[in-house]
Structures are given as structure tokens and as C-alpha cells.
């Protein structure tokens, strides 16, 4: 009984972090029932991954921006502009697809540097700079495209957003074994990482996670990864964009948790004056954050354009709102200083499953917008409630 009460106390203390996991699982179970099992069919799971990858890529950069106390309203327009530019490179000018992608990423970084300069060194609030960017880059995208789509793109380019890892069995086996191998390796890696981190915390007497909960968490991680692996391997295997996303999540999680730059981002968002007094070059942090956001927005634009096989003037409409919603649903604080890459990914998946589930049920876009708005409001209200409860208990 004492073990159960210990676990319960731990869960209550970590309600903010664990709550989004519970919400995601509950939403998946709900729509799996309402759609008579269609939600978790292999084809639909693959569709959810491919359709939401570019939003998740944007959410990685956006959570870093929001942790630092800023916001970026221009990412949807950057998606459109980079798609337009890459269309000119790859289709109109006939560049190799890989050269078009590299050049487009450079363009995205330059866009981020432009906005970062105004925010970091001129001192204009990010809201205003990126609002201006949203209008400017949308207009530039329409000018570059002359308000007409550019299509089709080279096969290599399209594969980035719509392709799958090669299947050596040519579809003759029941499960695509490359995906199975990657899934098993991913499960082993994640479990080993959790064990290593727990051992380090125990050695420093910092471990407060009950062992029973730790084992339950490990089992859940393994079952989740292997379950997704089975569903992907039952259809066409691993989408290339999922591999890109997984690498980004690993890299940026390490940056935020283990690097000096990551600690500077949290410090800048938690208390700007204290960060400056401690010697952190906050202007440099802000500048690099927007360069990074431009790079990731360009990558998201490439993924979206590749999936569409077309550069569209209206591409990216509303993407900034989806990315911001994913970050706040994933547990980031409105005031900055709090948030995680993993939380943003879970928030993005919640939005993606909601979109997909409501589409399967035949709900119109008006109802989808209504429900997503309410979910976002409830997520932020839950964050405010947790903060007020914490401050009351502290006093």
C-alpha cells in the first residue's frame, strides 16, 4: 500500500508532464473506439506520421523560441517562401534535387538571421518582427510563384516528404524488416538511456522516481515503440520524413538538456535580468534561436512541398498556429522558461490525432477548429491552475 501511495504522490507532483501522455493515450483510445478501429490501421498510422511531420518539425524550433520568451508568427509564410524558392531551384532552373534542398535550407537560415537581427540587436519585440515577416514572406512567396504552383518535382526531392526507406524484400514479406530492425533498436536505445539516467541520478542521490513507476514507464515505452513499429512495418515501412524527425528530436533534446546553449535558453526565458547578470550573451542566444527557427521552417517547407509534389502560394497557411498550439499543449509555459522538445512532440501528436480522428468521423473543418481551440484553451488553463496551486502550497 505504501508503494502505491508513493507512486500516487509522485504522479501528482509530476501531473504537468505526465498529464499530456495520459491525454494522448485517452484521445487515441477514444477515436479508436469511435472509428471502429480505423484510427490505428497501419495505413492510417502512416498517414498521421506523414501528414504531421512538418508541424512537428516546426514545433521543435517553436518550443525553443517560446522557452526563451519569444514567439514566431512567420513560420507558415517561411514554409511557403522556401517551397517557392526550392521549386525555382529544382524545377525552373533544373538544379539537382539535393542541391535545391541545401540551397533552400540556407535561404531559411538567412531568413531566420534577418528576423533574429531585428529582435536581438535592434530590440524590436519578436511578435512585431515575425508578424511583419508573416506578411512579407507570404507576399514574396506569391511573387516568386507568380501566384501559380510549380510542379512536378524530381523524384529524389519528393521522396523526402512522401518516400519510404527501401524494402529489400520488395514487399514480399509480411513485415518490412528494416522497419522492424529500426524499431527494436529504438526501443533498446530508449530503455537503455532511461536506465543510464536513473543510475546517474541514484549515484548523486537525486532520484525521486519510485521504482515501480520506473518499471511501468519502461514497459510502456517499449510497448509503444514496438507497437508503432509493427503498424508501420505492416504497411509500407518507415517514412523517410519520420527518420528525419527522429534525428531532429534526438539532437535537439540533447541540445536543450545537455548543452550550454540549451541552459542559456532556459535561463533567458526564466529570468532575463538574472541571465544577463550571470554573463549570458542573451542577444546572441536570441539571434541563434531565430536562425535555428528559420532553418527548421525551411526543412518543414521542404517536407511539405515534397509531400505535395508542388510549390503552392498558399502553402503553410495556419502552420504557425498549429506549431504554437502543439508547444503549449505539450506543457510549455506562456511566460517562458519551461518546456521540452518531447512535450512539444506529444502536443503535436495530440493535435494530429484530433485532426485525423475528426476527419475519419466526417466532422467538418468548422468543428475541428472549434474542438482544437477548446483543447488549447484547456491546456493553458491547466498550466495556469498548476502554477497557482504550486504558489499557494509554497506559501
Q: Can you say where each PLM-predicted feature lies in the sequence?
A:
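Cytosolic-side transmembrane-helix boundaries in multi-pass membrane proteins
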Residues: 1-29, 149, 186-219, 227, ...
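Single transmembrane alpha-helix segments in multi-pass membrane proteins
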Residues: 28-93, 114-127, 142, 256, ...
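Inter-helical junctions in multi-pass inner-membrane proteins, predominant
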Residues: 37-47, 146, 229-242, 253-257, ...
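Alpha-helical transmembrane segments within multi-pass membrane transporters and channels
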Residues: 94-135, 346-347, 351
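Loop-to-transmembrane alpha-helix initiation sites
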Residues: 126, 153-156, 172-183, 237-243, ...
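Transmembrane helix-bundle core of multi-pass membrane transporters
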Residues: 139-256, 313, 391-395
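Membrane-helix/interface signature in polytopic inner-membrane proteins
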Residues: 193-208, 250-290
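Transmembrane alpha-helical segments in multi-pass inner-membrane proteins
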Residues: 290-301, 307-373
Amino acid at each position: 500500500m505504501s508503494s502505491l501511495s508513493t507512486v500516487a504522490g509522485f504522479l501528482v507532483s509530476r501531473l504537468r508532464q505526465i498529464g499530456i501522455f495520459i491525454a494522448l493515450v485517452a484521445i487515441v483510445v477514444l477515436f479508436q473506439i469511435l472509428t471502429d478501429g480505423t484510427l490505428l490501421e497501419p495505413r492510417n498510422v502512416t498517414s498521421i506520421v506523414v501528414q504531421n511531420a512538418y508541424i512537428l518539425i516546426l514545433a521543435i524550433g517553436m518550443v525553443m523560441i517560446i522557452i526563451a520568451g519569444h514567439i514566431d508568427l512567420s513560420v507558415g509564410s517561411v514554409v511557403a517562401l522556401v517551397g517557392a524558392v526550392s521549386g525555382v531551384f529544382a524545377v525552373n532552373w533544373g538544379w539537382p534535387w539535393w542541391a535545391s534542398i541545401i540551397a533552400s535550407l540556407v535561404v531559411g537560415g538567412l531568413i531566420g538571421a534577418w528576423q533574429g537581427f531585428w529582435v536581438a540587436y535592434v530590440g524590436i519585440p519578436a511578435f512585431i518582427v515575425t508578424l511583419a515577416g508573416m506578411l512579407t514572406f507570404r507576399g514574396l512567396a506569391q511573387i516568386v510563384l507568380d501566384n501559380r504552383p510549380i510542379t512536378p518535382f524530381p523524384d529524389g526531392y519528393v521522396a523526402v516528404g512522401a518516400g519510404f526507406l527501401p524494402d529489400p524484400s520488395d514487399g514480399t514479406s509480411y513485415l518490412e524488416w528494416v522497419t522492424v530492425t529500426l524499431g527494436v533498436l529504438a526501443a533498446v536505445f530508449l530503455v537503455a538511456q532511461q536506465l543510464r539516467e536513473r543510475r546517474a541520478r541514484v549515484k548523486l542521490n537525486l532520484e525521486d522516481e519510485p521504482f515501480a513507476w520506473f518499471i511501468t514507464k519502461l514497459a510502456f515505452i517499449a510497448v509503444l515503440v514496438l507497437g508503432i513499429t509493427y503498424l508501420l512495418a505492416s504497411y509500407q515501412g518507415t517514412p523517410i520524413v519520420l527518420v528525419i524527425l527522429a534525428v531532429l528530436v534526438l539532437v535537439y533534446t540533447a541540445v536543450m538538456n545537455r548543452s550550454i546553449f540549451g541552459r542559456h535558453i532556459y535561463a533567458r526565458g526564466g529570468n532575463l535580468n538574472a541571465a544577463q547578470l550571470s554573463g549570458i550573451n542573451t542577444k546572441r542566444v536570441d539571434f541563434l534561436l531565430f536562425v535555428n527557427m528559420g532553418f527548421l521552417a525551411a526543412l518543414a517547407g521542404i517536407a511539405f512541398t515534397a509531400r505535395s509534389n508542388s510549390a503552392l502560394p498558399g502553402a503553410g497557411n495556419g502552420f504557425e498556429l498549429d506549431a504554437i498550439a502543439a508547444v503549449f499543449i505539450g506543457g510549455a509555459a506562456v511566460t517562458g522558461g519551461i518546456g521540452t522538445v518531447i512535450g512539444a512532440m506529444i502536443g503535436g501528436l495530440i493535435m494530429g490525432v484530433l485532426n485525423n480522428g475528426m476527419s475519419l468521423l466526417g466532422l467538418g473543418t468548422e468543428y475541428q477548429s472549434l474542438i482544437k481551440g477548446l483543447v488549447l484553451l484547456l491546456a493553458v488553463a491547466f498550466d495556469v491552475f498548476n502554477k497557482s496551486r504550486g504558489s499557494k502550497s509554497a506559501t
